[in-house]
Curated annotation (Swiss-Prot):
Subunit note: The exocyst complex is composed of SEC3, SEC5, SEC6, SEC8, SEC10, SEC15, EXO70 and EXO84.
Listed GO CC annotations: cell periphery; cellular bud neck; cellular bud tip; exocyst; incipient cellular bud site; mating projection tip; prospore membrane
Ranges in a coiled coil: 123-182
Family annotation (InterPro entries): EXOC2/Sec5, EXOC2/Sec5_N_dom
Annotated stretches, region: Disordered: 558-577
Note, other: Present with 3400 molecules/cell in log phase SD medium.
Organism listed in the record: Saccharomyces cerevisiae (strain ATCC 204508 / S288c) (Baker's yeast)
Keyword Metal-binding: no
Entry protein name: Exocyst complex component SEC5
Amino acid sequence: MDRFQIGDEQLLRFYQLKTINPTHSWAQDSSKLNNEEATSNELGVETSFDILKDFKYGNQISIDKESRAYLNDESLSYIRDPLNGQEMSKELQHLPNDSMRLNYLVNSKQFNVKAFLRDMHKQDSFNDLNNSLDRLDSDIQDQSIHLKQLVGKNFTKYVKIKNKLDQIYKEFDEKTNEKNQCDSPKENQINVESLNKKVDEVIRTTTFKLKPLMDNYQKILNYQATKKFIELNKFYFNLPKSLKRCLTNNDFNEFIIEYSKGLTLRRRFNQSSDASQSLVIKRIWTQIENLLVTYKDLIWNSLINSNFNIDQPQETILSLFSKLLNLENFINNNQRESESGNKNTTSSSNENPILRWMSIKMNGFQNELNELSGHMISKIIHSQRLILQNNTNQDKSQGCVELSYYLKINQLFQIISDTGKDSEGLKSTVEPNKVNTISGTSYLNLNCQPSSQGLTDSPTIIEMWLLILKYINDLWKICDQFIEFWEHIEKFLDGTYQNSIINEKRKENILIGDSNIIESYQKSLILKEEQINEVRLKGEEFITSVSQNLISFFTSSQSSLPSSLKDSTGDITRSNKDSGSPLDYGFIPPNCNGLSCLRYLPKIVEPILKFSTELAQLNITTNGITICRNTLSTIINRCVGAISSTKLRDISNFYQLENWQVYETVTFSSKSQDSSKNLTFEYGVTQFPEIVTSFQEVSIKTTRDLLFAYEKLPIINGISVVSYPSKQLLTGIEIQQIISMEAVLEAILKNAAKDKDNPRNSHTILTLTNLQYFRECAFPNILQYFDDAFEWNLASKNLELFSLLSKMESSIFGNYLSDLKINLRDTLEEKFHEINWPMYTSNSFRVGDYIIEALMILIVVHSECFRIGPQLIHKILIETQIFIARYLFEAFKPYVGNLSNDGSLQIIVDLEFFQKVMGPLLEKDTEATLRACLQNCFQNDTNRLQKCINEINPIVSANLKRTAIQFAAFS
């Protein structure tokens, strides 16, 4: 068969022409363009270069030529991005080899659209890419028109030339075969084959050059199809951006609406079998699903982070739950209706969202509570150790306590009522005496709140108090948030919130017409009885944790407090019975004084009372109420015990505060012995009684406020956690009060013991005046204050306290008098025996020295007592004049019947002078004793005695006149 015998059909099929003699354009005469649309759907972008497989070698040659022509450094500088017109040299130079660079050149056969958009335009928005695509499409259309014009202009010439060449080739083949067929056909055939190969190569090269034109046309069709698809589904492609905008604007309703529309489009796409579109659709849907997860997380975070304060009312919680349930229901419906079983679809948790929210929140409260307790107890223990380290060089029992702050107790606790400054402000229950202080210490009103000015203890101790206070206040904040949170839980447990949400959904059901929506919501909203019980037990666990932390702290001792950090159950080992020492109370700073306890313990207990009452009144469980009651009972008892122990310790050491200076003057009124007139004295006392009185009153008030806290706490639904204190407890408080007042007397005795060898000084006088003030004023008023505070009758009882006080007065005063009498005795003996009474003679009869010096001793005593304790002068003079009279009575006995005449007269002068000097202060016993002494000296010769007294009166008067100034104090 002749290889050059080719028919017209073969030529038309090979060149894809309609006619063997084309005269018009390529678009009209080519048969390929007519079926391009039919084959375009079958051929993808990835297989577009498989049209002419036999040109593979030529393709590789073309790639090499492209690499040499366009990928050198000089050519790269001219390559520009077809979308934005910017240079691409920097981006292309970072690629490792030339073959990869060709993927990013739009005119290359290896151009990869996805890689080009992903790497070169990853920062561009959808609008930017859309505008660039429009611009590129316009450029390609312009170029395509130009190419079409060029092909159409030269196509006829090309076909004619090709036809002519074929005819020449055919004629050449025929002539050559006829001429050389017999001679040497084999060699001639080789030449023909060579020529055939050359012609085929020319045809192949020509077709290869035409291929880019056909490829560009295919790309144009692909771009047009892509643009049309994007424009038709613009909403779907813009959906991620729209959903982000909804989240930013908190427009959650619009979010669900937009998502629903996108879900409808997604289902429609799933029904389509176009594989080329599925990848892009899946990627966009993945972004949408991620935004849905973000929306769900946003709702959860809003619920979890809710503080439930006044800024977040009930409507907000319901709104968040409504949105969450909408989303859960939407996801569930989506899963049921999904036919593709897409694993990437957001899944809804099978757990009830309400129970899950409650569990997460309560676990959060529990963790926050444990973290707070561990952190703050650790800091409190560290502060405790610092205090102990600072006091290692001091007396562990007493010396480390700062008592100097008691000197400013009235500035630290301004509790004195202004109405108490009148004469009726202070009244003793001991009649008929009435006492009031000039400077003013008055009855404390229970409603009076002490003001806090200045430090009550050393800075290191105050620092620990503040840490404890911060711990309790932070605990209060957590409990307060839990209480507000539980109020919302209670409305879920009793169905209030569920009814509100379901009613809202019913309204939506009327508008939407979805009959299944109510049933689907009820499954998520309705809680079973066992679920409700589990929630309540979870709430009880929180109350138990709070109680354990408080009990662990308030039942610790100074030595066991560090171990409370390790013990999470609150079972701190301690002795069954407190020793009464401040060391038994680890919740107060070591060596803190009573003032700081009185200031900070009420501040610490008050928040505990409030949040414990509110926790109990939530009525979570019956056991929860019992736990709160037991916890408060323990805390109150421990705080009262701490106040009592520190008060007793400090009062026992109050003697250290005595400075022996008159602090104030007290007016004392009493009846004369014959009750004929009122005697008024003013005596001075030190600051010691006022410190004791103020401290006692503040202690009583603070203790009373703690024990009677129920008066200030509300009772809701019949639930109260603090009740009226028991009689046993009040009896214990009464005993502690009496013990503390006895400790005052012990402190006074400690100072008095220092002067027992030299009692005649101002310290003894001030001690006696202080004791008198305690007996007549301070103690009665303290007892009356106690009775008013606790509705008790302590003041009416016959307490041994006052007997002990009187014995102390008598003992100290007796010691003072004993020393004075010894001094008088020594003086009298010395001067009395200097006179030779049997041989005594005198011309002037001046008062004897023994009388003058004895009276001078009394003058000194008068001077000592007059400013500090004038009420003591009378008692001292009574005792001393009787002592002097009795001493003289005994001293003159040996001389009875053995006195000279002048000696007898001298005795009359001395004794009459002594009586005249004493004047109104002269006691009848003294006068009778001295009269008996004179009668003994005159051997009971009363006539002679009276005659001598009358005769000697002028001499006595002269002596009185001469010593009037010297002894004016007695007049």
